[in-house]
Regions:
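Bacterial N-terminal signal peptides that target proteins for export
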Residues: 2-12
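Bacterial N-terminal signal peptides
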Residues: 10-20
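Sec/Tat signal peptide C-region and signal peptidase I cleavage site
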Residues: 21-25
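Short, glycine-/small- and polar/acidic-enriched structural segments
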Residues: 27-152, 156-166, 177, 218
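An extracytoplasmic/periplasmic, membrane-proximal ligand-sensing/linker region
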Residues: 32, 201-214, 218, 277-279, ...
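Sec-exported extracytoplasmic/periplasmic mature domains
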Residues: 55-62, 81-85, 165-169, 190-194, ...
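Pocket-lining segment of extracytoplasmic ligand-binding domains
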Residues: 92-94, 101-108, 134, 171-173, ...
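Ligand-binding clefts/hinges and TM-proximal coupling segments of bilobed small-molecule sensing domains
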Residues: 144-162, 238-303, 308-313
Length: 389
């Protein structure tokens, strides 16, 4: 499952020879007069990027973009589920929605019929930031160390668990220190109450640790360590190896990258029912007009064609696939991968419908257990990995 930026760039050498050179604005763009979407809260990188893309759409094509900021996964995903907005600039919760797990293992949710439009994979990474004074070089060195666990933050804790797995560790091999929130976990590192916590490599919280007397280090994830990556991706398959050139700490930069990991942020998704014209024209603008907005907000470089992971964990919208075929950026292997994801999505939806139609338990915990068991059984019967149980 390992996918790297290097692979994508090698692939491009072959496919871009037949693809058009995008030197001018995308032509014959047809988008709605108003396009609404949800995003992370104001001040977040995702919100700032959507504002810059909205400015491009307004100035070049007369489309007004209305952004609804949401402070948590529920507030970002609910308008998409209810059909109040056609798009969400989401985080990794979009993948959990696709799978119907965690907060989506709920009677009000279930597997979501979402499709990928585009993602941003820029110079930052995602991983476990570690205090620089405890001699940690790889995830295996975290054994016996104090690792932050955030109450109510599934995405964060799964990321931490995946990094521990890379080093052959579990929560039982470390001292789990619980915190009530993400920010408090990093205050805990500075105050010497914890040694490690999960975050984005350029986040203010990571900068806070880097500026403290303890300093900061990012444990190396050697891409040649196939077994380590298999363990990590068995827990969190959305991670991919990445040479991170933007990371907190004086020892990291363009010439001395953190050999680590990342996953896209934000993740621009729509429902499967999003009309083809909107999906197609939006991805055309994002790809063909990239030079016009790539410097307008931090992270916008990540929307370039070469930064798209064409074999990720959420299926592309059908109209996006057709666009990539037309420009020569689609292979047989990509189609096989896409077909597999669509098959998984359809199986999850039919399994959910059967489960909901069989008088499921009213108790939330019993409901979740029953659904997760039915889900795992259905996936395994088709030779697919449940990932979550």
């Amino acid at each position: 499952m390992i996918k790297t930026t290097t692979f994508t760039k090698r692939l491009l050498i072959g496919v871009l020879s037949t693809a058009p050179f995008f030197a001018h604005s995308a032509e014959n763009i047809e988008l709605p007069a108003t396009l609404a979407m949800t995003a992370y809260g104001t001040g977040s990188a995702g919100y700032t990027q959507m504002v810059s893309i909205g400015n491009l759409l307004q100035n070049e094509y007369g489309t007004s973009v209305r952004i609804l900021p949401g402070e948590n996964d529920v507030s970002r995903m609910t308008p998409l589920r209810m059909g109040r907005v056609p798009l969400c600039a989401c985080g990794i919760a979009s993948y959990y929605g696709f799978e119907g797990v965690l907060l989506f293992a709920d009677p009000q949710w279930g597997p979501q019929s979402i499709r990928l439009i585009s993602t941003s994979t820029a110079t930052f990474g995602m991983g476990v930031a570690v205090a620089g004074d405890i001699n940690v070089k790889t995830p295996a060195d975290l054994k016996g160390k104090r690792v932050a666990y955030i109450r109510g933050d599934d995405a964060n804790n799964i990321g931490t668990e995946a990094f521990l797995a890379f080093g052959g560790l579990t929560w039982d091999d470390v001292e789990r220190v619980e915190f009530p929130g993400y920010g408090r976990s990093f205050e805990g590192i500075v105050a010497n109450q914890a040694d490690a916590a999960f975050t984005m490599s350029v986040a203010p919280t990571a900068q806070q640790v880097a500026a403290s007397p303890r300093g900061i280090v990012w444990p190396e994830l050697d891409p040649a360590n196939k077994e380590g990556w298999q363990r990590l991706q068995a827990i969190a398959p959305y991670f991919q190896p990445h040479n991170v050139t933007a990371a907190a700490g004086k020892n990291y930069g363009k010439d001395s990258p953190w050999v680590g990991a990342t996953y896209p942020y934000p993740i621009l998704v729509g429902n499967e029912s999003l009309d083809d014209k909107t999906a197609r024209n939006l991805v055309r603008v994002l790809i063909e007009d990239h030079d016009k907005y790539k410097d307008a907000a931090p992270g916008n470089t990540g929307y370039s064609l070469e930064n798209q992971n064409m074999q990720w964990v959420i299926p592309y919208h059908d109209a996006v696939v057709e666009y990539y075929k037309e420009i020569g950026h689609w292979t047989d292997a990509m189609q096989v991968h896409q077909d597999g994801l669509v098959k998984r999505q359809n199986l999850l939806k039919t399994t959910w419908e059967s489960f909901m139609g069989a008088n499921p338990p009213e108790d939330r915990d019993a409901f979740r257990s029953g659904w997760m068991e039915a889900r795992a059984n259905a996936l395994e019967a088709e030779g697919m990995k449940p990932v979550f149980r």
